[in-house]
Design a protein with these regions (language model features):
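Cytosolic regulatory regions of ion transport systems
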Residues: 1-149
Length: 149
């Protein structure tokens, strides 16, 4: 029997690939659900959302005590996904300062802030860029039909 980040038996890639998602309400939950569906050991920390699909610790993801209770020390990957860039950077810095986490991915809403996040050692994921690329990709077949009409 192999136990993951949340103490729940997992058949995922490995305990070394435990992922902790911090904040993000529905976005954070969906990230956690998709990772869990791919077989990763996943936990979620969020102030207002209690997921039935993913083990969730209710609490402030900027509280080091809550992060410790959620298993941040056992995570090899943390995804910080609150709606505010400044808060995401603060939480990412707390994770780096207090826990030995290999990779910290930070959701960035403003593309202008991606370089700042990268400069301090985190992996930025720009929500604006990802969303706009997804919308354009979905619209492309419809728009190309208009060009041929």
């Amino acid at each position: 029997m192999k136990l993951g980040l949340t103490g729940i038996e997992t058949s995922g890639p490995s305990d070394e690939q435990a992922v902790l998602v911090l904040g993000g309400k529905h976005v954070g939950e969906l990230i956690a659900q998709r990772l869990q569906a791919d077989g990763y050991s996943v936990g979620l920390v969020d102030e207002t959302h209690d997921s039935e699909a993913v083990p969730t610790n209710a609490g402030d993801p900027s509280d080091v005590r809550i992060l410790a209770e959620a298993g941040a020390a056992d995570a090899s990957v943390v995804v910080v996904a609150t709606p505010r860039d400044s808060r995401n950077l603060l939480i990412a810095q707390l994770v780096r300062a207090h826990f030995d986490v290999t990779d910290v991915f930070v959701l960035v809403n403003s593309p202008d802030r991606s370089d700042l996040v990268a400069d301090v050692g985190h992996e930025p994921v720009c929500a604006t860029t990802a969303l706009s690329e997804a919308v354009v990709a979905d619209l492309e077949p419809t728009v190309s039909e208009l060009d041929t009409a």
